[in-house]
Design a protein with these regions (language model features):
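Non-catalytic, mostly N-terminal accessory regions of nucleic-acid modification and defense proteins
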Residues: 1-239
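Conserved class I S-adenosyl-L-methionine
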Residues: 239-245
Length: 245
């Protein structure tokens, strides 16, 4: 009976995850990005942001008992005193991306219509800029752990701004709102408890439309940064004599 329940959990989260991917692709299509080179970069980066955010919450709840008992993990983390929060970050393992409180998906969701937000110079802070700045700041904050070095030892960051692919400035914030509203609908937390390799089939589903028809979407490949993260997720333990392309 326990095994049946576990499989039902996996089935449910698989359906939700594939629906999220389809919804993200639909959003791209609605904003004129369907089938464009930018669509693939948006989908993979947004999915990775979702994964790393949920993984962070899951790992934080393992090292901080009070968080594990909370109904809303991100809300409980946000309420933590800053000193306790910094201590918790130090206790997380090296394979977990570290997040600041304003990096959370819930933070972006709660501020998507906040007209009171201002930049340092006092000018309005459009939501698409907040979204982009959050992704870039996560990448910079985790540069030493989650980045890939080129042959010239230049570090390729985890994320880049995604609203740049929306041509019309007036539509950029609406695009980012549509994205963030899809990311709050469920959590991967249940999957992290399973030994089943859930994400292998999800990654196949994620890229299936970009790896067929020999050029229908121009020429696609998995960015080195994304491929490296995928490899770390799918392969556990030390690996030698292996190259990620």
């Amino acid at each position: 009976r326990k095994e049946l329940y576990r499989m039902m959990q996996i089935e449910s989260i698989t359906i939700k995850t594939k629906q999220m991917i389809d919804d993200l692709k639909a959003i791209c299509a609605n904003f004129g990005l369907g089938g464009s080179p930018g669509e693939y970069k948006i989908i993979t980066q947004v999915f990775l942001y979702k994964y790393l955010s949920d993984k962070f919450g899951y790992e934080a709840s393992k090292v901080e008992p009070s968080i594990a008992e909370a109904e809303n993990v991100e809300a409980a983390l946000t309420a933590m005193p800053d000193e306790d929060y910094e201590m918790m970050l130090m206790m997380l393992g090296g394979n977990v991306a570290k997040l600041k409180k304003n990096h959370y998906i819930s933070y972006l969701f709660n501020h998507q219509n906040d007209d009171s937000m201002k930049k340092a110079d006092g000018t309005p802070y459009p939501f698409h800029e907040l979204f982009d700045d959050t992704l870039v700041d996560i990448a910079n904050y985790n540069l030493d752990i989650f980045s890939v070095q080129t042959g010239s030892e230049e570090k390729i960051k985890l994320f880049e701004p995604i609203s740049q692919y929306v041509i019309e400035t007036a539509k950029k914030s609406a695009f980012c709102r549509a994205i963030i509203n899809k990311l709050v609908e469920f959590s991967f937390a249940e999957v992290f408890e399973q030994k089943y390799d859930f994400f292998s089939q999800i990654f196949e589903y994620l890229i299936k439309d970009y790896n067929k028809d020999f050029g229908k979407y121009a020429e696609y490949y998995t960015p080195h940064t994304i491929a490296d993260i995928i490899a770390r997720i799918m392969v556990h333990g030390e690996v030698t004599n292996a190259t990620v392309y």
